[in-house]
Swiss-Prot record:
DNA damage listed as a keyword: yes
Residue segments, region Disordered: 77-147
Species this protein is from: Homo sapiens
Keyword annotations from UniProtKB, A to Z: Acetylation, Chromosome, Cytoplasm, DNA damage, DNA repair, Nucleus
Function according to Swiss-Prot or TrEMBL: Cell-cycle-specific regulator of classical non-homologous end joining (NHEJ) of DNA double-strand break (DSB) repair, which can act both as an activator or inhibitor of NHEJ, depending on the cell cycle phase. Acts as a regulator of DNA repair pathway choice by specifically inhibiting classical NHEJ during the S and G2 phases, thereby promoting error-free repair by homologous recombination during cell cycle phases when sister chromatids are present.
Position of sequence motif XLM: 147-157
PTM annotation (N-acetylmethionine): residues: 1
One GO MF term attached to the UniProt entry: damaged DNA binding
Biased composition range(s): Polar residues: 123-136
GO cellular component terms listed in the entry, alphabetical order: cytoplasm; DNA repair complex; nucleus; site of double-strand break
Protein name, UniProt field: Cell cycle regulator of non-homologous end joining
Amino acid sequence: METLQSETKTRVLPSWLTAQVATKNVAPMKAPKRMRMAAVPVAAARLPATRTVYCMNEAEIVDVALGILIESRKQEKACEQPALAGADNPEHSPPCSVSPHTSSGSSSEEEDSGKQALAPGLSPSQRPGGSSSACSRSPEEEEEEDVLKYVREIFFS
């Protein structure tokens, strides 16, 4: 009988007391907080990558692209120079090679490098005075010019 009385006592509770219990059961506050807290770190983790992308303007992108291209060209030249210095055969060491990165529109540079390939035994200081302007400049200047040409083609055409 006592169990019946306890059941009846729960049914006899005042409405304000049952409403409070019903509120706790119907809308638990812990579940939404957990979801919100889980969503905040995910959003915070995404922010740095997004900010990095949006902070770069066109000038910065061009600077980074130039830096990468120049660095890769320097590495290529560094790998080629020891091989060229060790080679005694003139056919293995062309004095002024045309880089694979030059555009097809520079036919005069290709013709000039062909003229210098005719005299492979001469060092750069022994070449005739009428050598091309592409080889009279330093290799770094030529690399920068090629890189700038590509950047202009990509971003400004």
